[in-house]
Amino acid sequence: MVACRAIGILSRFSAFRILRSRGYICRNFTGSSALLTRTHINYGVKGDVAVVRINSPNSKVNTLSKELHSEFSEVMNEIWASDQIRSAVLISSKPGCFIAGADINMLAACKTLQEVTQLSQEAQRIVEKLEKSTKPIVAAINGSCLGGGLEVAISCQYRIATKDRKTVLGTPEVLLGALPGAGGTQRLPKMVGVPAALDMMLTGRSIRADRAKKMGLVDQLVEPLGPGLKPPEERTIEYLEEVAITFAKGLADKKISPKRDKGLVEKLTAYAMTIPFVRQQVYKKVEEKVRKQTKGLYPAPLKIIDVVKTGIEQGSDAGYLCESQKFGELVMTKESKALMGLYHGQVLCKKNKFGAPQKDVKHLAILGAGLMGAGIAQVSVDKGLKTILKDATLTALDRGQQQVFKGLNDKVKKKALTSFERDSIFSNLTGQLDYQGFEKADMVIEAVFEDLSLKHRVLKEVEAVIPDHCIFASNTSALPISEIAAVSKRPEKVIGMHYFSPVDKMQLLEIITTEKTSKDTSASAVAVGLKQGKVIIVVKDGPGFYTTRCLAPMMSEVIRILQEGVDPKKLDSLTTSFGFPVGAATLVDEVGVDVAKHVAEDLGKVFGERFGGGNPELLTQMVSKGFLGRKSGKGFYIYQEGVKRKDLNSDMDSILASLKLPPKSEVSSDEDIQFRLVTRFVNEAVMCLQEGILATPAEGDIGAVFGLGFPPCLGGPFRFVDLYGAQKIVDRLKKYEAAYGKQFTPCQLLADHANSPNKKFYQ
């Protein structure tokens, strides 16, 4: 039973839902400081209870930095030494954030394994003192309690949390290629059981406060307060503090017991884990699952299992030592550096570098109720934007509105929304067949078919009815925005907003500016994207922009590899084993063969031989036979509703046979096939930076990983060049250039990096 539970919870772990870590917005307010010399921690005494307030300066979140560690140790030593203090409360002064985890910059600054290991051991010592405190300590949790923050909280004798959506607890270290390094791998299994602890540590998922209480991670819940004389956030923190003080006094007076009664299932699970055979089966099954899903690309999950196992089998001392050692090893790996780089990139791409727009977008209109248009509508109404969804036909409009409702209803099924909240959000959407109400629109996003003449027509129609300040954004994936804006009376108000499908799940938004796009238009587009919860890259206009331009040459190589006789299943296996979340052949089916054909033709005309490779006739014949991919039920594979397993489409055999190419043995090993795909992608990405399409390598990495599925463990194309080596990539390209020609010619910037070993995209 225990093994089944462990396998069940790990089934949600895929390689890799990387870096979906949340960014929590926290508003600072000032608390009185006991000592002016302290900048991160202050405390006051209420009766015989010390209230320790955490407040990292100049930051929206509290992070466990060296400075905070030092001040926290100093404060706690004063509390333990005082005869007037009998208990303590730990609370944050920042609404929406208890402690968000360790300071990643502190970890990134470490140059040696020994430095990182020492950081872990120091954190373990501080947290152990909390756990062994003779004076009861209550953690009062409001907002994000993640990583090291959770490790601090579970070492306290009691935990109280606000029952609020912003209050989440979790161990996201695995998403950064690391593991909990302050004793979490040892305390968490004892607190919630081994299966639940492994689930938290291996997936990095966050748990809401009500769920945390059921698990035993939290002892009491406090309802958040509404508005009053003070803002709701401030009132809630004050109330949480009052409740925590009451419980701290009760613990000191022995009127409240810190021990929690466990349920029958927990007791049975705990008993089962005392049986050596059961434990070994759990370890074995979990390790098998992890190996299958990570494909050996991410070292952290297996080391987490190893550390947990060490603590259970050899005792806590051995477990803590193993934890600090493995923590040090992991933080120094290329995978961890790549994932931490992506985290920093996300932070960068969640800021509006254009500043605040002159006018907030409150009313949005979307043209086209297809898959993309409806998806954009969903992420807009979900964030409170009044949205018009327009289409030319009632059938398409109804289908689009149903898609939005279904997306919201799925959240109800997952208990992320109530039915009332769903209906309230859905009421923000208005579906219509005409332009009524567009005179109030602040922004119009067109999501019509990829046809320039059609986009010109709707742009002219829209400009006849929208107000002067209204922005026109095109959700094109490849057509140059300047060509779309050519018929506009106000080209400074035209911009590209390239969303990715499915819109409600894909994090990336690629914003495209032309030479005529105004700064305020850019600021408004970024502001809308951020409100929709997107990670945003801003690129210059050009055929294919950045993401489509990187994907197109790789897809051309996919076609050539298929023509050379590699079957789609093997090609998928080779690409996923390299770290791509979706196989290359499956990706064509998911994107749509007709879309791939359209992009290949358009970009092929612009870039010529350099974008060549496979014969696009393959895609043309597939489209003529109706093999459009998943949406038509057939592509390279056959798709059936409700059936996960997909078989090869045998009707493709004749098409592939008619276009078969002889493979070149010197460049056809499995490794060569992988690198033929990846080097074309990387070379094009670097060329985009060289040409100024991209502003920074960080945006290039974020766009590639979050928009195109470039392997997160490699950190994106630019981080990959730094970690793998520019010279090695150029050598690969030259090898393939000798076999295939200009398609593999290294771009100048990449060659420059190869010729100067000290030259890096990230310093």
Swiss-Prot record:
Changing residue 305 to N: In MTPD1; mild phenotype with slowly progressive myopathy and sensorimotor polyneuropathy. Induction: Up-regulated by thyroid hormone (at protein level). The modification N6-acetyllysine is found at residues 46, 60, 129, 166, 214, 249, 289, 295, 303, 326, 334, 350, 353, 406, 411, 460, 505, 519, 540, 569, 644, 664, 728, 735, 759. It catalyses: a (3S)-3-hydroxyacyl-CoA = a (2E)-enoyl-CoA + H2O; a 4-saturated-(3S)-3-hydroxyacyl-CoA = a (3E)-enoyl-CoA + H2O; (3S)-hydroxyoctanoyl-CoA = (2E)-octenoyl-CoA + H2O; (3S)-3-hydroxydodecanoyl-CoA = (2E)-dodecenoyl-CoA + H2O. Pfam families: 3HCDH, 3HCDH_N, ECH_1. The modification Phosphothreonine is found at residue 395. The modification N6-succinyllysine is found at residues 46, 60, 166, 213-214, 230, 249, 303, 326, 334, 350, 406, 411, 415, 440, 460, 505, 519, 569, 634, 644, 646, 664, 728, 759. Changing residue 282 to D: In MTPD1; mild phenotype with slowly progressive myopathy and sensorimotor polyneuropathy. One of its GO terms (molecular function) is enoyl-CoA hydratase activity. Its EC number is 2.3.1.-, 4.2.1.17, 1.1.1.211. The keyword Transmembrane helix does not apply. The active site is at residue 510. The modification Omega-N-methylarginine is found at residue 399. The record marks 498 as: Important for hydroxyacyl-coenzyme A dehydrogenase activity. Residues 1-36 form a transit peptide. The record marks 151, 173 as: Important for long-chain enoyl-CoA hydratase activity. NCBIfam families: fa_ox_alpha_mit (TIGR02441). It is linked to Mitochondrial trifunctional protein deficiency 1: An autosomal recessive metabolic disorder of long-chain fatty acid oxidation, biochemically characterized by loss of all enzyme activities of the mitochondrial trifunctional protein complex. The disease phenotype ranges from a fatal form characterized by early-onset cardiomyopathy, cardiac failure and early death to less severe, late-onset forms with myopathy, recurrent rhabdomyolysis, and sensorimotor axonal neuropathy as key features. In the N-terminal section; belongs to the enoyl-CoA hydratase/isomerase family. Heterotetramer of 2 alpha/HADHA and 2 beta/HADHB subunits; forms the mitochondrial trifunctional enzyme. Also purified as higher order heterooligomers including a 4 alpha/HADHA and 4 beta/HADHB heterooligomer which physiological significance remains unclear. The mitochondrial trifunctional enzyme interacts with MTLN. Mitochondrial trifunctional enzyme catalyzes the last three of the four reactions of the mitochondrial beta-oxidation pathway. The mitochondrial beta-oxidation pathway is the major energy-producing process in tissues and is performed through four consecutive reactions breaking down fatty acids into acetyl-CoA. Among the enzymes involved in this pathway, the trifunctional enzyme exhibits specificity for long-chain fatty acids. This is Trifunctional enzyme subunit alpha, mitochondrial. It comes from Homo sapiens.
